[in-house]
A protein has these predicted regions:
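Conserved structured core elements
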Residues: 46-50, 72-78, 94, 102-106, ...
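Walker A/P-loop
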Residues: 61-82
Length: 143
């Protein structure tokens, strides 16, 4: 049986929600019976991951800054993706490497979008250094 989390997302996007509601949604999402438990075989809730997701959700809601450090295997990616998607706000995620960017956009983000029934828009943005400059190419071909 697959539960739909779309009503949960509509609640987030259509009106301001209380801290208690936001906390409850995050706890439900990260529970064994929640969106992640249903979407990821063998998913095990981790308290550190839930705590981080709540902190990220609070920072987004309060438009404040947050720095989080956590060890390998803590579940950092899902801990920031879930509140980012649930927020209904524009969020920019900057990665430390192109490999992590590719993993995030092509593996983790589609999984979260599917698990949460997210209906918003996501985009992969790259800097100018990632594209061919036709002017430079033509100059190189002449030389």
């Amino acid at each position: 049986m697959r539960l739909s989390f779309a009503p949960l997302l509509k609640t987030c996007h259509n009106r301001a929600i209380s801290v208690a509601q936001r906390t409850g949604m995050i706890e439900k999402t990260f529970s064994q019976q929640g969106a992640l438990g249903q979407a990821i075989p063998g998913f095990q809730p981790r308290q550190a991951q839930v705590d981080m997701a709540k902190a990220v959700a609070s920072a987004i809601a309060n438009q404040s800054q947050l720095v989080v450090e956590a060890g390998t295997g803590t579940g950092k990616t899902f801990a920031y993706l879930v509140p980012a998607l649930l927020s209904g706000k524009k969020v920019i995620i900057s990665t430390g490497s192109k490999n992590l960017q590719e993993q995030l956009f092509h593996r983790d983000l589609p999984l979260m979008v599917s698990a949460l029934g997210f209906f918003g828009q996501v985009a992969l943005l790259k800097g100018r250094a990632n594209y061919l400059c036709l002017d430079r190419l033509s100059r190189q071909m002449v030389e």
